[in-house]
């Protein structure tokens, strides 16, 4: 059970285990003496939540269903998760712009502000490896929710929300730069942190650690399994 704005509501359902992570950095057989190399940790995502969601969350969900119409709502909202007092609507990626525009414009919703875009890479979430999360805020109603959209590694396309929330401009560029998510419809989807000719996306879980020359003084950072251990 969780508490959402003082009203008891249903928490997340059974966690969905998508991977088992061994070691802190994925390196094996290294000279690591910290003990972190022996860590074994399950990677799990929160499960879907039952009603009542708690607090204003039920009002938001009902208002969105009324504004979209039940058929479009059912085709758009894949799952609802209440976890740590936060409401997350998992949205079918093709429906993201219409859902975001409805959340922004409907008088009962009025989520006028998108606070950014965060990327996450879950290699164990088969067919949904790349996630993009959008925290939204209603200044009118003083409420917060989150949208989340997933795409597979082999088709990393998600519609841009620039036309709905122009503030996502640089955030989508950064998420593209670091995770390789392609935001279709973005007016200028170019790298924003890494050099234009950089190969790969460095915050993905499959991006190699170390072994990249540090050009400004000629040193080299070795991969974790080649690093020297100090006692």
From Swiss-Prot:
Membrane topology: Peripheral membrane protein
Keyword Transit peptide: no
Stated family: Belongs to the complex I 30 kDa subunit family.
Purpose of the protein: NDH-1 shuttles electrons from NADH, via FMN and iron-sulfur (Fe-S) centers, to quinones in the respiratory chain. The immediate electron acceptor for the enzyme in this species is believed to be a menaquinone. Couples the redox reaction to proton translocation (for every two electrons transferred, four hydrogen ions are translocated across the cytoplasmic membrane), and thus conserves the redox energy in a proton gradient.
GO cellular component annotations of the record: plasma membrane
Compartments it resides in: Cell membrane
Keyword set, alphabetical order: Cell membrane, Membrane, NAD, Quinone, Translocase, Transport
Record keyword NAD present: yes
Subunit structure: NDH-1 is composed of 14 different subunits. Subunits NuoB, C, D, E, F, and G constitute the peripheral sector of the complex.
Listed PANTHER family: NADH DEHYDROGENASE [UBIQUINONE] IRON-SULFUR PROTEIN 3, MITOCHONDRIAL, NADH DEHYDROGENASE UBIQUINONE IRON-SULFUR PROTEIN 3
Protein name per the record: NADH-quinone oxidoreductase subunit C
Pfam families with a match to the protein in the record: Complex1_30kDa
Molecular function in Gene Ontology: NADH dehydrogenase (ubiquinone) activity; NADH:ubiquinone reductase (non-electrogenic) activity; quinone binding
Catalyzed chemical reaction(s): a quinone + NADH + 5 H(+)(in) = a quinol + NAD(+) + 4 H(+)(out)
Record SUPFAM superfamilies: Nqo5-like (SSF143243)
Principal cellular location given in the protein's record: membrane
Protein's organism: Mycobacterium sp. (strain KMS)
Gene name in the database record: nuoC
Superkingdom in the source lineage: Bacteria
InterPro entries documented for this protein: NADH_DH_suC (IPR010218), NADH_quin_OxRdtase_su_C/D-like (IPR037232), NADH_UbQ_OxRdtase_30kDa_su (IPR001268)
């Amino acid at each position: 059970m969780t508490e959402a704005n003082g009203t008891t509501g249903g928490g997340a359902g059974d966690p969905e285990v998508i991977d088992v992570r061994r070691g802190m950095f994925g390196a094996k057989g290294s000279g690591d003496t910290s003990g972190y190399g022996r860590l074994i940790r399950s990677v799990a995502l929160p499960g879907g939540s039952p009603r009542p969601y708690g607090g204003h969350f039920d009002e938001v969900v009902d208002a969105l269903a009324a504004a979209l119409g039940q058929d479009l709502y059912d085709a758009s909202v894949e799952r609802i998760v209440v976890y740590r007092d936060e409401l997350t609507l998992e949205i079918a990626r093709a429906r993201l712009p219409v859902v975001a525009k409805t959340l922004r414009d409907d008088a009962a919703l009025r989520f006028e502000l998108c606070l950014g875009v965060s990327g996450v890479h879950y290699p164990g979430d088969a067919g949904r490896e790349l996630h993009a999360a959008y925290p939204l805020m209603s200044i009118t109603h003083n409420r917060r929710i989150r949208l989340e959209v997933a795409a597979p590694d082999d088709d990393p396309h998600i519609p841009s929300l620039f036309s709905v929330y122009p503030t996502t401009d640089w955030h989508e560029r950064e998420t593209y730069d670091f995770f390789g998510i392609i935001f279709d419809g973005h007016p200028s989807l170019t790298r924003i942190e890494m050099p234009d000719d950089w190969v790969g996306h460095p915050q993905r879980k499959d991006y190699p650690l170390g072994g990249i020359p540090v050009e400004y003084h000629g040193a080299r950072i070795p991969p974790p399994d080649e690093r020297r251990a100090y006692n």
